[in-house]
Amino acid sequence: MTPPSRIVTPERRADDVGDTALRPQTLAEFVGQQQARANLQIFIDAARKRQEALDHVLFVGPPGLGKTTLAQIVARELGVGFRATSGPVIAKAGDLAALLTNLEERDVLFIDEIHRLSPAVEEVLYPAMEDFQLDLIIGEGPAARSVKIELSKFTLVGATTRAGLLTNPLRDRFGIPIRLNFYTVEELEGIVSRGARVLGTGITPDGANEIARRARGTPRIAGRLLRRVRDFASAADAAAIDRRIADHALSALEVDAAGLDAMDRRYLSTIALNYGGGPVGVETMAAALSEPRDAIEDIIEPFLIQCGYLQRTPRGRLLTSHAFKHLGLAEPSREASQFGLFGGDEE
């Protein structure tokens, strides 16, 4: 995983506990994801009118976009109980059975990182989702017997950042799949402004815009940057966060105007200066940066690709003209880098 010191990591950090107060409580307060919100509102209203459990919901998208918040809102809007856990925590079938048998009628069970459920647990989950019953084997050997346990009708809300790792049988049992996308700067401005109001901090429109532009399309990062910029504003006895204070604070935190931090720039600079802009293999980059391959592929690269700084090619990673411009470097001849001795043989 990425080092916890990265302020722009979309993953949850220990200091994000303060972000709970910034979370919207209703769909009406939730900013962004317009189509997803509109559809969810219809499904929730229909289930509430029929007094039925909502169909199982699967949220798919990068970390930090509000999957957990939306799951909590679903339960709140339905007026039912909410239980939360994560895939790695449910180690065996008995753990899942304990959760399911304690649910009341129409309750919401939220499983984060649902792609990390073990196959044995998934097998128990299938009949629970489809028929609202548990099929458990009690005992071992000749004395083993199958026991069916009827469950209350419940709604399973799953969340995953890696939909490709979900098995087809599990994916097919979710009646309401919803993909969350990165937020626009305008949407993040609204989130930052609302967060400032909740925190009791004044903020100008251009101050909110400065934070939003550097938040990498991710509300979790926007909230984290807002809390740190607020510290700078308080230390300076400023009445409100304006563009100048936000720019000073974020520059001090090494988050540049494009939302790139020191690790991003180091990644791009390494390819540009050491490997002629690429192509270079991911294993080579992992060794050069002393970072695990998973951290590079799952955390560092997605935002760089999304912003058009990086291409993944069959021969390796390749910087774009946009990346060289951002670094303030001249773009080298591609022939030299494409056929040079730069180790670009790994995808």
From Swiss-Prot:
SMART domains: AAA. Residues 257-347 are annotated as: Head domain (RuvB-H). Residues 184-254 are annotated as: Small ATPAse domain (RuvB-S). It catalyses: ATP + H2O = ADP + phosphate + H(+). Residues 1-183 are annotated as: Large ATPase domain (RuvB-L). DNA binds at R293, R312, R317. Gene3D superfamilies: 1.10.8.60, P-loop containing nucleotide triphosphate hydrolases, Winged helix-like DNA-binding domain superfamily/Winged helix DNA-binding domain. One of its GO terms (biological process) is DNA repair. Transmembrane segments: none annotated. Belongs to the RuvB family. Has 3 domains, the large (RuvB-L) and small ATPase (RuvB-S) domains and the C-terminal head (RuvB-H) domain. The head domain binds DNA, while the ATPase domains jointly bind ATP, ADP or are empty depending on the state of the subunit in the translocation cycle. During a single DNA translocation step the structure of each domain remains the same, but their relative positions change. Homohexamer. Forms an RuvA(8)-RuvB(12)-Holliday junction (HJ) complex. HJ DNA is sandwiched between 2 RuvA tetramers; dsDNA enters through RuvA and exits via RuvB. An RuvB hexamer assembles on each DNA strand where it exits the tetramer. Each RuvB hexamer is contacted by two RuvA subunits (via domain III) on 2 adjacent RuvB subunits; this complex drives branch migration. In the full resolvosome a probable DNA-RuvA(4)-RuvB(12)-RuvC(2) complex forms which resolves the HJ. This is Holliday junction branch migration complex subunit RuvB. The gene is ruvB.
